[in-house]
């Protein structure tokens, strides 16, 4: 597989004017090893759907790097030092796939 850097995908997603913050993690995949999954917090009043965000990202970063799954959330969890809490995102992903 290819290396995908979460920060690259997060930066691309947050270029969208309706996206306030994005956090990206890998989800285990039988086909590719891992799939890119994004958690996105929208700006107040924004109305974007997950499929619209996936398509927008695919047009921007394309190839294997765009997220195959997007979860629109109220807030992207942060660590006490203000970084994206990827462990919390992976936990949410596991819980949502049960």
Question: Where on the chain are the PLM-derived regions?
Answer:
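General small-molecule cofactor/ligand-binding pocket signal
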Residues: 70-73
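AMP-binding/adenylate-forming catalytic core of the ANL superfamily
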Residues: 1-65, 75, 82-91
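Acidic/polar alpha-helix N-cap and adjacent early helical turns
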Residues: 91-98
